[in-house]
């Protein structure tokens, strides 16, 4: 026996078999050891050969295990095994068979054939009992080989390579494993048209990710199976090439090329009966390329040019431009077929076609209105992905969430069960008590417990019954789907008797049973289990994905929106017009009456410093999100240079920071529903506003990397001090129309008409009146109280102290900011000293009263001692 005459895989198997014999304590290395290792192989080549030869691989495995169990075992041996006589004869038989077939190396299939032929080996009888004859096995080997010989140590990789490195889409279509393909007739027809050409008959499907390129290939496979193709494509096989499997494990140089050549040779030998589908076609360019080696695309070019290889490619627009178009020789061998994103109406049709498969998988029903909502909401709110993929994902996740709810215990039952457990614990505690009152309580508790247990048992039974009904409907759907598949197979095979039984007997009966089961599901007036996916479920998933509140408003939220002015007025004093304008925009948006192609609202807040422009924006973020941090604040004083616009939308290609994206665009991409504040806009360079034109008009902006960012769910607020001198000069009771005209003149001089024309409303903030200062004092002190609440210190302000602070903090030219300084000077600073001196320990109540030129702090009721 010359080990060099054996292929790499056979050598590996023999090594494994020898190791196994040693581990088991067998003294002899027998054919049974070799057969066991061959049958245990992950890739299952030997098992596959046995099955194809009409044998039973499982039976062969059992027989081998039984034979090995009979072999004598030796313990404490010298750690070596001896080659048995039968195995030596098997090796000789394998070498003879290889020589006879013209092979340079003994391969796995020749070794298996020798194990079946050599009568002195126990493996011959094992394989014979499993139903394998040497003649049939030899026949199968010749079918796989197709006249090719093993002339390299890795020869096995070249045999039956399509089965290893490709999926048969037509076989999957025949078995009903592919999802139905709805619409896309034009693209499939165009693909068939290109495939039917004499030369350059290789279409490449080009489109955005998620528009259904792979689905078109599956649609072609379904058409081939149904015979709905021209004569030139009838009975062809569509095989999807798996580039990952081709590359994986190719350790040595030339191994990848050898595998790919084997695939191409097999396709060529079929005489045009195989169409190769290469998904993610751009992976061909550069695949397997190493120093001096050819990549996959160069290996394909000659076969494509000669028309020996029928190929359908699929890739995205970006990848096609980046990889395939650069290689002009490869690009010209393919004929592009553009796959456009379907419309919302087409997407609804696609979802209706897929609905049954998803209902069957999740075991819930999906309403038609949910499909319409999935298409419409995904189109409107999920802007960075494409239809129909995003709509299908929405439907899938909504059904998955509902299934989880069905499998979980209903809330009312869960509460009952917890109450029962609580009462049982109380009962055990009361049993230990001997007094009369405890015994009375125990008797009452026993009554409560028994009634609760009865209620829980009834609810559990009802829940289980509803779940069971749902399960029955799902099982019927599965049976119906299998029957329809069987009908199609019977029609294709010409088994008309079976087809008639299915079409006029089995299928109508199943449909009737399913209709009855579904009508019973909906019969309950108040079901515990929701079994239908509704538009609300879809809206909830959209809200989870994007953070945009799409789902149905609860009663509490409606009331909150109707009282929005009152809520905002708690934080912003004296600016009724501004509060109303902002509130109207939010209500319009949440009621669904907002223009879907523009931001929720865009406002310019004009007014002197310190009157509440930025404060109103913060209050709005707090109202909408219960969180001030949901505010994207951009200080325009940082954008005084022309080039600084790159910081907003991201640096262009070739500049430092290109990969990082822009401050504005990245924030809105991650959180599409937020308030964007451009503070002090008059300080920015005028060219910065050119970027905002399409945001204000179309609700979108293209960032430095060419991605479109959606601003349709943002509220854009810009603040400015322009014309503040006119507003400051305005008296308390003067007419503001003339002042407004003066302010607008200044604004028009500072900003271009096309910018101002796109803003929804320009709102003037009035200077603060003395009468409004008391309310602002309360707002500012509320913040101080929150800081003190950590130390359980309560701050109580007398009316005279409030007036004192309002007087000291009022300055018409500077708004409310001097009040902050007054509170800091007269309240925070002296209070900080007293707290540090220990005058007001934790838990104190501090009363603040006005003095002549300062505020006095006194320990209030509830304190341990008096302090002046």
UniProtKB/Swiss-Prot annotation:
Q: List the disulfide bonds.
A: none
Protein name per the record: Chaperone protein ClpB
Q: Which domain of life is it from?
A: Bacteria
Membership in a protein family: Belongs to the ClpA/ClpB family.
Q: Which InterPro entries match?
A: AAA+_ATPase, ATPase_AAA_core, Chaperonin_ClpB, Clp_ATPase_C, Clp_N_dom_sf, Clp_R_dom, ClpA/B, ClpA/B_CS1
Source organism per entry reads Rhizobium meliloti (strain 1021) (Ensifer meliloti)
**Does this entry carry the keyword Membrane?**
no
The record's domain comment reads: The Clp repeat (R) domain probably functions as a substrate-discriminating domain, recruiting aggregated proteins to the ClpB hexamer and/or stabilizing bound proteins. The NBD2 domain is responsible for oligomerization, whereas the NBD1 domain stabilizes the hexamer probably in an ATP-dependent manner. The movement of the coiled-coil domain is essential for ClpB ability to rescue proteins from an aggregated state, probably by pulling apart large aggregated proteins, which are bound between the coiled-coils motifs of adjacent ClpB subunits in the functional hexamer.
Residue ranges for the region (NBD1) are 160-341
Q: Where is this region: Repeat 1?
A: 6-71
Where is region (Linker) located? 342-547
Q: Which Pfam families match?
A: AAA (PF00004), AAA_2 (PF07724), AAA_lid_9 (PF17871), Clp_N (PF02861), ClpB_D2-small (PF10431)
Annotated coiled-coil positions are 392-526
- Keyword annotations from UniProtKB, A to Z: ATP-binding, Chaperone, Coiled coil, Cytoplasm, Nucleotide-binding, Repeat, Stress response
Q: How does it assemble?
A: Homohexamer. The oligomerization is ATP-dependent.
Q: What is its main location?
A: cytoplasm
Is Ion transport tagged as a keyword?
no
Q: What does this protein do?
A: Part of a stress-induced multi-chaperone system, it is involved in the recovery of the cell from heat-induced damage, in cooperation with DnaK, DnaJ and GrpE. Acts before DnaK, in the processing of protein aggregates. Protein binding stimulates the ATPase activity; ATP hydrolysis unfolds the denatured protein aggregates, which probably helps expose new hydrophobic binding sites on the surface of ClpB-bound aggregates, contributing to the solubilization and refolding of denatured protein aggregates by DnaK.
Positions of the UniProt region annotated as C-terminal = 768-868
Region annotation Repeat 2: where it falls in the sequence: 83-147
Q: Name one GO molecular function term.
A: ATP binding
Compartments it resides in: Cytoplasm
Give the residues the record marks as binding ATP 1. Answer: 207-214
In terms of CDD domains, this protein maps to:
AAA, RecA-like_ClpB_Hsp104-like
